[in-house]
């Protein structure tokens, strides 16, 4: 029915004062490049990436923040882009899967490929960006819900249990979890000893 009052015609809705004020300008950095978009304030980051910027690597899975297919990084932290309003990104740094590696595969992408950590591949961009964030969190010593030693200083130990917990926001409908855990383990490098 448009942006106007419920039951109003689309033409009437377009002429309403609400329609005139329904565009916001947002400036942010995407994959290292400055962006400036004029968007409906209700537009999600996912829709801005896919429909306005034509970056289709980020996938629309559930559109409810439950599957992780739309995971991107905002200021280094993973977010569900289907739940993030693009208007909230003023001044933020966003990384989509397209920004992870330009000329060759990143070590994380190479590990996913080497370990066959996908089947259909639909969830893979979100899985990979979650892995990027996971490795950064572990390096900084950020604990998870299953971290055994909360007093440990330095990088977190990435056991298979830790990896599964830290990747639990990403669903693989094909069931490639064993290979995903192996790929994350490979990307993390050799285990650190205390």
Give, region by region, the residue ranges found by the protein language model:
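Signature of N-terminal electron-transfer/Fe-S-associated modules in redox systems
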Residues: 1-194
């Amino acid at each position: 029915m448009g942006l106007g009052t419920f039951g109003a015609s689309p033409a009437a809705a377009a002429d309403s004062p609400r329609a005139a004020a329904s565009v916001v300008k947002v400036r942010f950095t995407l994959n290292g490049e400055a962006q400036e978009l004029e968007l409906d304030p209700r537009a999600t980051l996912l829709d801005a990436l896919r429909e306005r910027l034509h970056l289709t690597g980020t996938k629309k899975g559930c559109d409810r923040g439950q599957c992780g297919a739309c995971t991107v990084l905002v200021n280094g932290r993973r977010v569900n882009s289907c739940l993030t309003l693009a208007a909230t990104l003023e001044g933020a740094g966003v990384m989509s899967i397209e920004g992870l590696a330009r000329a060759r595969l990143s070590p994380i992408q190479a590990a996913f490929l080497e370990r066959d950590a996908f089947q259909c591949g639909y969830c893979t961009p979100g899985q990979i960006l979650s892995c990027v964030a996971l490795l950064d969190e572990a390096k900084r010593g950020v604990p998870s819900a299953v971290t055994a030693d909360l007093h440990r200083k330095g990088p977190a130990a990435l056991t298979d249990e830790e990896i599964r917990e830290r990747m639990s926001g990403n669903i693989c409908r094909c069931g490639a979890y064993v290979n995903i855990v192996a790929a994350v383990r490979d990307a993390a490098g050799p285990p650190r000893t205390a």
